Amino acid sequence: MKMKITKGGTNVSYRIDNTFLQIKNYNSFNHQINYELLKDFDFVPKLISNDQKEIVWEYVEGNEPVVDLNNIKAITNQIKQLHNSNLNFPKNNLKQRVQYYRQKMVELNSGIEIIDKYANLIDDILDKMDHSTPLHNDLFPFNMIETKNKIYFVDWEYATMGDKHFELAYLIETSNMNSECEKVFLDLYSDYDSYKLLLNKIFVNYIVILWIRTQTSAPYNTTFFEQKIINYVTKLTN
């Protein structure tokens, strides 16, 4: 039985019996990873086939998790396993993505003041990022599947080398992690720099605004993310 899956914004996906079929829709930044590299991670669904047009995974039945104290240890351990794997992922492309989104925003006339106001700060953050760690790069909770015994990380199409602080900040920000859970998460991860993490929290909210204002339809509501940038910049300067 073939059933279309509506979740996900780039590719066209279907469940076919016990498999997950994804028809690839390429942009300049996705599907660059060699998916075979992921085969040794027990938190990645089994890869069945992959070619230029489509990729097929084992279908995992489960739910999108709420990241909290009940599962943060398992999630952290998996992130550490990935970051310490020494796998050679594609070259980081965050700088190119930001440039592309900014130009697209001009074309769509969807810009807002905060994007220009903090452009120099963002460029400086990008210039100083480390690129030595293999990253998933899109660890929204909706790219996780929670089962009875495991949390799977899925949708690896944007995976590249990069700065571990980006991955940490990305999960904290996109999951709206509360302060107690964040402290446990960072204590468990342990090997991080709090200043670099703060810079990457600013960057994550910036790129989320860019994405919303270039990849979704108007009206745009990015006030929440704009305020988070302002709050984090205030912390940066205090």
From Swiss-Prot:
<dbReference type="InterPro" id="IPR052077">
    <property type="entry name" value="CcrZ_PhaseVar_Mediator"/>
</dbReference>
<comment type="similarity">
    <text>Belongs to the peptidase S49 family.</text>
</comment>
<protein>
    <recommendedName>
        <fullName>Protein LicA homolog</fullName>
    </recommendedName>
</protein>
<dbReference type="Pfam" id="PF01636">
    <property type="entry name" value="APH"/>
</dbReference>
<dbReference type="InterPro" id="IPR011009">
    <property type="entry name" value="Kinase-like_dom_sf"/>
</dbReference>
<dbReference type="InterPro" id="IPR002575">
    <property type="entry name" value="Aminoglycoside_PTrfase"/>
</dbReference>
